[in-house]
Amino acid sequence: MDKGKENRAQGVLKRISGPVVTAVGLDAHMYDVVKVGNEELMGEVIKIQGENIIIQVYEDTAGIRPGESVGNTGLSLAVELGPGLLTSIYDGIQRPLEVLVDKMGNFIERGVSAPGLSHEKKWEFVPTVKKGDEVKAGDILGTVQETNIVHKVMVPPKAKGGKIKKISGGSFTVDETVCVLEDGTEIAMLQRWPVRVPRPVTQKLNPDIPLITGQRILDGLFPIAKGGTAAIPGPFGSGKTVTQQQLAKWSDAEIVVYIGCGERGNEMTEVLTEFPELEDPKTGKPLMERTVLIANTSNMPVAAREASVYTGITIAEYFRDMGYDVSLMADSTSRWAEAMREISSRLEEMPGEEGYPAYLAARLSEFYERAGRVISLNGEGGSVSVIGAVSPPGGDFSEPVTQNTLRIVKVFWALDAKLSQRRHFPAINWLNSYSLYLDALNEWYDKEVSPEWNPLRAWAMGVLQKEAELQEIVQLVGSDALPDEEQVTIEVARMIREIFLQQNAYDAVDTFCPMSKQYDMMKAIKHYADLARTAQTGGATPQQVIGIRSKNELPQIKFIRDYEPELAKIMKDMEAEFDAMRAV
């Protein structure tokens, strides 16, 4: 929090109801940060009703009592932005967990504050502008080599700008002045920004470049654009967290912000232990060097879940303003919505559907609308892609959080418990999922992958839909009762499912599949389907066509890094088998 002049107007606690407390005699504005009780717990003003100031407390309120003092800081909830964010692990209100561990061991005590960034560490600042240059809000003044990522030091968005009077390179802490403008404005590497306010941009752009994730079902059938929004709803155990972690590991965003919002502590532990060991495929450095983690597990106070979501998106916007592509994972937005429901009921507000507050949709859209591909104030192009997991109770997609999320996001990756029970992973149901970015991304796929890619994708989806229609008949009378052509369609659909859609997140090669390989795999399956149709026209039986041995080698391609020679051999053998069939 800001350590400037704190307007510590004193009030008194009147009522305590879990994380929601009421104070009287306090001079406060909406969203002011306050210190509650003798232990000075951190809270935020969420409602003002006459004399009553209603506060949500970001720490456990057990043991505080009416009559204790409440102090107003006069500041809104803000995050510290500057060098040192990357590789950090924060709680929901940007307290670095590593610093808290040093202060008090593994269990966080109440009323302890720690700055989001180290104010002692020195960073090597290299100016990119010189004395006499004119700068405006958002302009880049210089760079700091933070990790492998270059951190760009910018003029704060609310600054007036002007001519540079003095700027110097060298080692500085985040608090020290690196640039002085002619009007006397001093600029340090540290910025503070209120989390509920979106950072300003010059222009929003149409999202027309895909965020490549290396997951075949996502890149191939339901792509998300850079600056896009996606939801991953699914019942428990269907693979939401693993899918989120795969996206955090392999998506081609330059910065990843991962928010563990009210999820199990074990899952956050997995992320915290895995990420430092994983290698970024593009740089060969640890993945953690491009990651900011916000750990806010389910046993932490519920009010901090809301703060963690806003903290994460504000950090993501900061890196976007530098010109980076950022992907933000929120796991899970349902836990945040449940926190809203709990606080709303404590405020005795009129409940909406299933007890959620009437403003649920507004809060969700407020969050997702901060995604986008933009031109920032300094002319750099950057993006924030938001991927939110949703955990509907019992896998019921008709519940309010899922339905309101679907109204806002443009990509829907529907996880299916039945698929996960059949050990089909990622368990994304190809019939229920959709992407509204397909038309916008077609041109990119034509140019960067192949002009054949879009027709190939449409063909694959057509085969999978045809299989779903035939499945009822197959379950009643068996596949042998189908016409010859449709028996082969069932086999081709099985190949698409098992060879293309299934992917092993724990295999060193198959965990990430580049677009070129996805295209070659899909083309190989289509080539088999074309050869099979030609053979059937020539009188071959479905049993002969399905019995082609070389096609059984195709699944092995997934696990071979330099797959091209092996794939070429399989295709050659396949053509030879079909030629031999025709000769008979």
Curated annotation (Swiss-Prot):
GO MF annotations in UniProt: ATP binding; proton-transporting ATP synthase activity, rotational mechanism; proton-transporting ATPase activity, rotational mechanism
Subunit structure: Has multiple subunits with at least A(3), B(3), C, D, E, F, H, I and proteolipid K(x).
Main location: membrane
Entry GO CC: plasma membrane; proton-transporting two-sector ATPase complex, catalytic domain
Record flagged with keyword Transport: yes
Function noted in UniProt: Component of the A-type ATP synthase that produces ATP from ADP in the presence of a proton gradient across the membrane. The A chain is the catalytic subunit.
Family the UniProt entry places it in: Belongs to the ATPase alpha/beta chains family.
Reaction(s) catalysed by this chain's protein: ATP + H2O + 4 H(+)(in) = ADP + phosphate + 5 H(+)(out)
Organism whose genome encodes this protein: Methanoculleus marisnigri (strain ATCC 35101 / DSM 1498 / JR1)
Compartment annotation: Cell membrane
Highest taxon, organism lineage: Archaea
CDD domains referenced in this protein's UniProt entry, alphabetically: ATP-synt_V_A-type_alpha_C, V_A-ATPase_A
Binding residues annotated for ATP, in chain numbering: G234, P235, F236, G237, S238, G239, K240, T241
Record membrane topology: Peripheral membrane protein
Name of the protein in question: A-type ATP synthase subunit A
